[in-house]
Amino acid sequence: MVGAERLREVDRIVAAVHAWAVTDEQVHAVAVVGSYAAGRPGMSSDLDLVIVASAPKRLLPDIDCVSAAVGVHAAPVRERDWGRLRERRFRTPTGLDIDLGIVALSWLGTPVDPGTARVLRDGCQIVFDPEGVTAETLHSLGVTVRHWAGMQ
């Protein structure tokens, strides 16, 4: 079970990512996926965020951009490719791991890739989606559209 302080930390980080996303014109959408989105995080759960961008490669090398996005000093831990998703993992001073998955807009395109569909079906809450691209993809998968608290 996750304590109240960890939940507040996650909410602060998600709010900071939202504030950053609305200022970056290449960001089309942001969503929380995984255990926090599904409502079943544990103390060892990481915070998984997917950032949908028009130019994902431009976001990758800029560590300052990522630190600004998460709103706290977060040390880089690793980078990994998961097919069309490029993951950057960071760790906060409290030990919370944040996985930022950066993808192109085509990641949400139809037909939806089986890996993408699994990620979205396993838990997805929209943080930022001004064009409705995430909501449209969730609808196409028969997944209920849910927004992170206060991010509608």
Regions found by a protein language model. Give the residues of each.
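Short secondary-structure capping/turn segments at boundaries of alpha-helices and beta-strands
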Residues: 16-19, 33-38, 74-76, 85-88
